[in-house]
């Protein structure tokens, strides 16, 4: 289950306790959870409508990752991937199919800050704000990487 699916569960009024039960099995087995915090494909129209401060990124959305961290407090690190294409005309699918010759991938291991561990995303406004600030700082680094020349 993706963190986006978790956010959808919560937005439909599902109880966080139910999510914790569902995620309980993840504590016993190795799993990978993918969160696409941008939430959607980048287009110039979406970029302009969001008034994004990042030149090549949409604003990050914190709901999915916030609920995941809330229900899985044993997550202490995240792998952050940033993929830089040599052309704005190509898609992620083109990348997966090997249709691009010049791609840079930045992979970073990021520690989840202590102030974001064992918090309740649904009820703790301070946690939501701190999580947004953390994501924004990660996005600043992504933006710098994407703006560097090939």
Q: Which stretches of residues belong to each language-model region?
A:
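Membrane-interfacial amphipathic helices and adjacent loop/beta segments
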Residues: 1-20
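A cross-family acyltransferase "interaction/gating" segment
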Residues: 2, 27-120
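Charge-dense, low-complexity intrinsically disordered segments
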Residues: 9-13, 55, 122-125, 129
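Generic hydrophobic, helix-prone segments enriched in Leu/Val/Ile
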Residues: 19, 75, 95-96, 135, ...
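Short amphipathic alpha-helices and their capping/turn segments at secondary-structure boundaries
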Residues: 19-28
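Accessory terminal regions of nucleic-acid processing enzymes
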Residues: 118-150
């Amino acid at each position: 289950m993706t963190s986006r699916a978790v956010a959808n569960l919560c937005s439909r009024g599902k109880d966080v306790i139910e999510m914790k039960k569902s995620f309980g099995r993840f504590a016993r087995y190795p799993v990978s959870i993918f969160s696409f915090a941008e939430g959607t494909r980048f287009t110039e129209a979406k970029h302009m409508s969001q008034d994004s401060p990042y030149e090549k990124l949409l604003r990050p959305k914190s709901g999915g990752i916030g609920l995941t961290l809330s229900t899985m407090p044993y997550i202490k690190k995240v792998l952050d991937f940033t993929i830089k294409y040599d052309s704005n005309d190509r898609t992620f699918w083109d990348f997966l199919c090997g249709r691009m010759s010049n791609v840079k991938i930045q992979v970073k291991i990021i520690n989840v800050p202590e102030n974001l561990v064992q918090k309740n995303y649904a009820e703790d406004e301070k946690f939501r704000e701190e999580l947004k600030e953390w994501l924004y700082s990660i996005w600043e680094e992504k933006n710098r990487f994407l703006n560097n020349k090939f």
